[in-house]
Amino acid sequence: MAKCKRNRNKTKRNFTVKTPTANQNYKDTVFRMLFSDRKNLLSLYNAVNQSDYNNPDDLEIVTLENAIYMGMKNDLAFIMDTNLYLYEHQSTYNPNMPLRDLFYICSEYQKLVDKKSLYSSTLQKIPAPNFIEFYNGSMVAPDCTELRLSSAFEHLSGEPKLELIVTVLNVNVGHNAELMQHCNTLNEYAQYVARVRHYAADMSLDQAVER
């Protein structure tokens, strides 16, 4: 996987507009459909983490009960090796992903931990969170970058006392070759989106999707 670029204080990212653009709904639907399958999701997990797990049942899918309320309908959340992973597909650049993920993870931890146990003298263990965004919008972006919650803090002085980092992986054709090589489903999805974009330049999006 490509090494991510870090930028703690600047909110401006290396994203520039490129045309033509396509409606994001079809991409969201296809991505969610493909990786709701445990086998495909495990393949994606292995590619991202450079691991070689082979039992899809090792994935513990987390139910996103508050996903609709939070506008996070494209999420895939699961626990693997006592770590909690939140995968989100995005067709547009969204600098607010760290804040959205903070709201989600706080809600999820509330479900995982017995509130009464918070008043005990025993340290309550929780899954370590990991936030990954798979970006395939029409704006030019690096292979890998990071969005930080601290970028939203006003008048931040010194190191932030709270941080949340979202790793953004560009999954457009021509990006993250190693990731694509290790997850064939993701590679095929990227090829599909590229074809639709190509056809959409000369016909309606509905026709391009069906072609």
What residue spans do the PLM features occupy?
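Elongated, amphipathic alpha-helical interaction scaffolds
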Residues: 2-211
